[in-house]
């Protein structure tokens, strides 16, 4: 394989196959019934890999949504005669499933504490909050490592939430 080996633009920029589109439609309908809305779905880089991104929610709700999504993906895949692989690295050298949550910090009035200002004066708040986050990561690095250390994370770089389906 070349250095990255996954420059499969024909898949990434291609249209979603009809069988997969039908599956994704049914997944969306099931998720709506459960109160989970997805805003993005498209092909991903690896063969037969697709992304589904839920709409932003509070952290505890977003984590629950991710669990519901994974269960729904597998259930609906079976109904369509498909197999949904959610492993971080199902095959050597090929992207796998990256399940993660993004986070932000806002005040009660809706001010985004991680929004860089447009002027040096407005940027002070962002720099202070960022410095505090970096200090916390430094002080609690052992706890962060323990919370993320598992065999799956040993074999994957940072990635995004993916759905992997067969190509046929």
What are these regions (language model features)?
Residues 1-11, 42-52:
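Residues forming anionic-ligand binding surfaces in small-molecule and nucleic-acid pockets
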Residues 161-167:
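Conserved small/polar residues in nucleotide/adenosyl-binding loops
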């Amino acid at each position: 394989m070349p250095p990255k080996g996954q420059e499969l633009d024909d898949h990434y920029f291609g249209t979603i196959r009809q069988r997969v589109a039908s599956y994704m439609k049914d997944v969306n309908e099931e998720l709506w019934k459960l109160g989970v809305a997805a805003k993005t779905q498209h092909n991903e880089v690896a063969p037969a890999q697709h992304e589904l991104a839920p709409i932003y929610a509070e952290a505890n709700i977003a984590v629950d949504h991710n669990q519901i999504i994974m269960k729904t993906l597998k259930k609906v895949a079976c109904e369509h005669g498909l197999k949904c692989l959610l492993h971080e690295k199902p095959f050597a050298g090929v992207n796998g499933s990256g399940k993660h949550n993004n986070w932000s910090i806002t005040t009660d009035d809706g001010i985004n504490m991680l929004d860089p200002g447009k002027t040096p004066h407005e940027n002070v708040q962002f720099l202070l909050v960022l410095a505090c986050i970096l200090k916390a990561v430094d002080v609690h690095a052992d706890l962060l490592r323990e919370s993320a250390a598992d065999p799956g994370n040993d074999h994957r770089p940072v990635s995004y939430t993916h759905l992997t389906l067969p190509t046929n």
